[in-house]
Amino acid sequence: MKCVCPLRVNTFFMKTDLQLKSRYDGLPLSALVVEPDGRTPEAVLQIAHGLCGCKERYMPFMEYMAGHGVACVACDHRGHGRSLRKSGDLGYMEGGYSALVEDMKQLTDWSVSHFHNIPIVLLGHSMGSLAARIYLKKYDWELSGLILSGSPGNNNMAQAAILLTGFLCLFNEGRSKQPRLQEYISSRFNKKFSSEGPLAWVCSDPAVRNEMMTDPLTNFTLTANMMHNLLSMMVRTYSKQGWAVLNPELPVAFLSGEDDAVMGGEKKLHDAAKMMAGLGYNNVTAAIFSDMRHEILNETDKEIVWNDILDFISKIPSK
């Protein structure tokens, strides 16, 4: 097998809005494709964003990747961005996380049919990193690489918290907003940075935090249903059951910021990497970036991370 050539720089790219209908339940899915203009991409990077995220927040990163020969596809998760049945569904995950994972598989299938026979790398950030590992349990053979950014550390309290959110979901189909619970979780992450504002734990760049605060697609209140699915995803991700490991040589990279409160400490990151290695994945690495917080793709020194991702992709064998 030959390896993908060193990625070439090209400042021209094409951006395409993509509308899909979920095969799972017909939910409208809003996606975005950013690809090199005038040449065939050397890889496809599929992005699974985090909680309260949306695909547009990754545009600078996707443009950079496309400029270096990597096509990017990203889809708003159900209950996020514009992947909604109605406007009031923002913060509500209709169909649950199983539907979300099948939506991700649908985007992979679209990428395979559109780009033809080039490596597909999945990048999951935060909640997206949980979804990516649940995806991996079923579909690891579809991927040529996996990148897990801002992975939440395993939390032994998740199982107990599921009982609370499960109870809340008994009422109004789990659509009740949970501002106090959401604020409590965020404040715990923000303890170290409280003097800088309520979202300082997310990123050290005030401009990034201001964008999140002022954008209605990223500043919204979660429902009991969304929190229940998030916790359920954590439990499912860190369960050693259900892993087929059909692609044991798959390159897997954990990438986190040194000051990422969601990580729960460097030991938990390395424990997550060791777990995957123990399951039978033979090419698992973990890297921690100094002076960076949760959103390493948006930090002030983000191009360090972007270039490491390009390097990771450039070493993936071509098909």
Feature-to-residue mapping (PLM):
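Alpha/beta-hydrolase-fold enzymes
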Residues: 132-217
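Alpha/beta-hydrolase active-site loop
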Residues: 93-112
